[in-house]
Swiss-Prot record:
Disulfide bonds: none annotated. Keywords: Chloroplast, Membrane, Photosynthesis, Photosystem I, Plastid, Thylakoid, Transmembrane, Transmembrane helix. This is Photosystem I reaction center subunit VIII. Its main location: plastid. One of its GO terms (biological process) is photosynthesis. Belongs to the PsaI family. It comes from Oenothera elata subsp. hookeri (Hooker's evening primrose). The lineage of its organism: Eukaryota, Viridiplantae, Streptophyta, Embryophyta, Tracheophyta. Pfam families: PSI_8.
Length: 34
């Protein structure tokens, strides 16, 4: 169980920025289209 947080924390640290980047790029695309 000690290894789970070790893997889970960096995973979230990578997934969260990825989602933020994706939503940001979507907003930029929408602004360019409009």
């Amino acid at each position: 169980m000690t290894d789970f947080p070790s893997i889970f924390v960096p995973l979230v640290g990578l997934v969260f920025p990825a989602i933020a980047m994706a939503s940001l790029s979507l907003h930029v695309e929408n602004n360019k289209i409009v």
